[in-house]
UniProtKB/Swiss-Prot annotation:
Keyword Iron: no
Protein name: FMRFamide-like neuropeptides 26
Family stated for the protein in its record: Belongs to the FARP (FMRFamide related peptide) family.
GO CC aspect terms: extracellular region
Superkingdom in the source lineage: Eukaryota
UniProt main location, coarse: secreted
Amino acid sequence: MKVMFMLALLFSSLVATSAFRLPFQFFGANEDFNSGLTKRNYYESKPYKREFNADDLTLRFGKRGGAGEPLAFSPDMLSLRFGK
């Protein structure tokens, strides 16, 4: 009975140590696991950032009016906030 307990204890310790050792042995300890992530500069602009467009505001804040209907948001209002 003691022999079976010692064998089970040795086998479990072997399994526990191989769980940490084998991945580094087969996959390499110096492999970059975050290869898909690129670290960018904090102040660098985002490449997928859209340009600001006045039509975006007209579509968001008011529907485009017909012939005589005024817009709920006019692109001329940009000069009040953005100085353009």
